[in-house]
């Protein structure tokens, strides 16, 4: 919505996808965006294969991979859960969703495209592995803490610029097992079997010291 407002370019095309559950009032879906959607005909809502917009569905990944393969100049990912009763474990709980968002982004990202994704704490092996993966796939990776984000809030944004890959299909196929277990309660402990370079881990520790 912000990018659409700033660019004011009717030739742009925006695709939005989020979880839709009409039986759960805690899932906002697009209820608060009706006016925005009415006023911007170049914004399209994607519900994917199962019509729920669930990013943890393998069928939905395959659907979006086929439909939008290597077509997106800019991808943003701002998904999350309600952590109001369990702030201390939001990094672990969100790990699978964050990884799924990264996989979706890789599946649709155009070469030289950019990706913006929200992380929370970045202390666990899983988080460091995901950041290392992004550093391999994009030319430049930056951490950003917006002025509007409270200091006590662990959220931070990772800006990834200049996607390196011409074709990501083979890589995406290797991530299919991540989607085999549909439970959001199954957390990701690590991604790589190899050891992440110590220099990279050291840089993440420095960033954690700055942002907390």
Predicted regions mapped to residue ranges:
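Beta-strand elements of modular eukaryotic interaction domains
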Residues: 3-5, 65-66, 104-107, 131-133, ...
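Class I S-adenosyl-L-methionine
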Residues: 129, 133-183
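Short, ordered loop/turn segments at secondary-structure junctions
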Residues: 19, 120-121, 146-147
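Flexible, glycine-/basic-rich loop-and-beta segments that form/coincide
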Residues: 160-212
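Beta-strand cores of modular interaction/reader domains in eukaryotic scaffold and signaling proteins
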Residues: 13-15, 76, 116-118, 142, ...
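Anionic group-transfer/hydrolysis microenvironments
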Residues: 80, 120, 163
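The AdoMet/dcAdoMet-binding core of the Class I SAM-like
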Residues: 1-83, 88-100, 123
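Conserved Class I SAM-dependent methyltransferase catalytic core
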Residues: 88-142
């Amino acid at each position: 919505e912000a990018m659409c407002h700033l660019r004011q370019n009717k030739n742009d095309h925006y695709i939005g996808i989020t979880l839709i559950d009409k039986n759960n009032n805690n899932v906002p879906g697009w209820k608060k965006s009706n006016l925005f959607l009415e006023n911007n005909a170049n914004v399209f809502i994607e519900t994917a294969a199962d019509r729920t917009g669930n990013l943890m569905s393998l069928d939905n990944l395959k659907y979006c991979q086929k439909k939008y393969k290597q077509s997106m100049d800019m991808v943003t990912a701002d998904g999350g859960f309600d952590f109001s009763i369990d702030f201390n474990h939001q990094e672990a709980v969100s790990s699978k969703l964050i990884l799924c968002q990264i996989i979706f982004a890789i599946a649709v990202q155009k070469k030289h495209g950019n990706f913006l994704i929200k992380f929370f704490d970045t202390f666990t092996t899983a988080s460091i592995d995901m950041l290392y993966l992004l550093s391999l796939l994009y030319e430049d990776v930056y951490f950003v803490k917006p002025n509007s984000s409270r200091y006590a809030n662990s959220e931070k944004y990772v800006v990834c610029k200049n996607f390196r890959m011409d074709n990501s299909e083979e890589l995406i196929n290797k991530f299919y097992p991540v989607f085999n277990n549909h439970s959001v309660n199954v957390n990701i402990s690590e991604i790589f079997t190899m050891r992440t370079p110590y220099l990279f881990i050291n840089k993440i520790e420095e960033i954690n010291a700055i942002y907390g």
